[in-house]
Design a protein with these regions (language model features):
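Hydrophobic transmembrane alpha-helices of secondary-active transporters
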Residues: 60, 64-89, 295-314, 329, ...
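Functional cores that coordinate and move charged inorganic groups
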Residues: 144-250
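Entry/N-cap segments of selected transmembrane alpha helices
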Residues: 86-113, 183-192, 313-337, 361, ...
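Structural signature of hydrophobic alpha-helical transmembrane segments
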Residues: 64-76, 124-138, 161, 179-192, ...
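Predominantly late transmembrane helices and immediately cytosolic-facing juxtamembrane segments
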Residues: 1-15, 49, 209-217, 221, ...
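C-terminal ends of transmembrane helices
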Residues: 4-10, 77-93, 141-152, 195-206, ...
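Transmembrane alpha-helix boundary signature
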Residues: 32-45, 58-64, 78-95, 110-130, ...
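Hydrophobic core segments of alpha-helical transmembrane domains in multi-pass membrane transport
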Residues: 22-35, 75-81, 111-116, 193-198, ...
Length: 383
């Protein structure tokens, strides 16, 4: 019975659609909880939790902010690892292919903001244009997981890159436009840590503990600076080394493994493990380790803590009379689509970049429709 349960659980974890299922379930639960549970939803997620280390530092945030600023760093770290892998070894290693999602992402930031401003120019809400500029990477990845292998791998790579560039741009907007105070001293520390990480990756250090410590330090520094702390995940992910296995390292790992089989003791087992770790980049190992945690825990918990929007007849009636609502709808639904799809066509027609051979404009058209899902960064801006 226990063996059967373990087998079923392992299959659930490996299934790409499991994360999307949990994400949808968490969103529904959040909506029901917020609308049927009185004020318990708001009270629970606004409960404060603090960590103190003597007089050195203290962090005091609500549970919702711990999730948005802390747990979501793991999500951005994972997608940045995937982007780095695609740029170095995957579908986007040629600049002409990588340039299309980058150009599309920039246009996807500008066009929605202009449309939103056109609806709200001259009102007190005109400065809220940042709400419509972001694509929700978590939800887009969840939707892509539902389709699984029915979508080209190249489309996923393009959309992931587009979403990451989009999110980084949106987070920079938060840092420069919507952040009241930025402390530059911690940012100097960020530059120092990033420079050290660059040197470490050049040396192909394989121990994950080094990068975990660096990531925690980056997170604290970004948090202290006033810049959104999830950027730490992006910086760390882009600085982790990725490389194809070298034949000599693979042969060495194989030799050590055979030696362990002949002499199964702790010393030979440890040597075999180290040999295998050295042959695989830290980027790929981190992706493998973090994917189930992020997809099955982090993203659903994020949705549960943020998707609880109170819906009533009165709020809907007021919303649809407001130019703010129509600016958001037009910016996200129309602006993101026009910006991303239009820029992709222009970039390819002007030969700024090119699409992968198996991708057609119909794929980009479908993918562009997904970019109008704006949730994560919009909530960060609202905060």
């Amino acid at each position: 019975m226990l063996t059967k349960f373990k087998s079923s659980f392992s299959a659930f974890v490996r299934n790409e659609t499991s994360g999307a299922t949990l994400l949808l379930a968490a969103t529904i639960v959040a909506l029901l909880w917020a609308n049927l549970g009185g004020h318990s939803y708001e009270h629970f997620w606004h409960t404060h939790f603090s960590i103190h280390l003597g007089d050195i530092f203290s962090v005091d945030m609500s549970l919702q902010h711990w999730i948005n600023d802390g747990l979501m760093m793991m999500f951005f770290f994972l997608v940045s690892l995937e982007v780095k892998h695609d740029f170095v070894m995957g579908e986007l290693r040629e600049w002409r292919r990588a340039s299309v999602p980058v150009v599309a992402a920039v246009a996807g930031l500008i066009v929605p903001a202009l449309i939103f401003y056109a609806f709200n120019a001259g009102t007190d809400d005109a400065d809220a244009w940042g709400v419509v500029i972001s694509t929700d990477t978590a939800f887009v990845m969840g939707i892509l997981a539902v389709f699984g292998n029915r979508l080209p791998v190249q489309l996923r790579a393009l959309l992931v890159t587009l979403a990451v560039v989009d999110d980084v741009g949106s987070l920079l907007v938060i840092a420069t436009v919507y952040t009241e105070r930025i402390s530059f001293v911690p940012l100097i520390g960020v530059v120092v840590i990033a420079a050290l990480l660059f040197l470490v990756q050049r040396a192909r250090v394989y121990r994950s503990s080094v990068y975990i410590a660096a990531g925690a330090t980056l997170w604290l520094l970004f948090l202290a600076s006033g810049v959104h702390a999830t950027i730490a995940g992006v910086v760390l992910g882009l600085l982790l080394p990725v490389f194809p296995p070298e034949r000599s390292e693979v042969l060495r790992a194989e030799e050590l493994t055979h030696h362990f089989r002949r002499t199964p003791v702790a010393s030979t087992g440890s040597a075999a493990v180290i040999g295998i770790l050295r042959s695989v980049s830290i980027n790929e190992r981190m992706q493998l380790a973090l994917a189930p945690i992020v997809n099955l825990i982090v993203v659903p918990v994020f949705a549960l803590s943020n998707a609880g929007v109170i819906i009533s007849g009165e709020t809907l009636q007021h919303a649809f009379k407001s130019p703010l609502t129509w600016g958001i709808i037009a910016g996200l639904v129309g602006g993101k689509y026009l910006g991303v799809f239009g820029a992709s066509i222009i970039a390819t027609k002007l030969r700024i970049g090119e699409l992968a051979q198996c991708l057609a404009y119909r794929h980009i058209n479908a993918g562009s429709m997904l970019t109008g899902i704006g949730f994560t960064i919009s909530l960060f801006i609202i905060d």
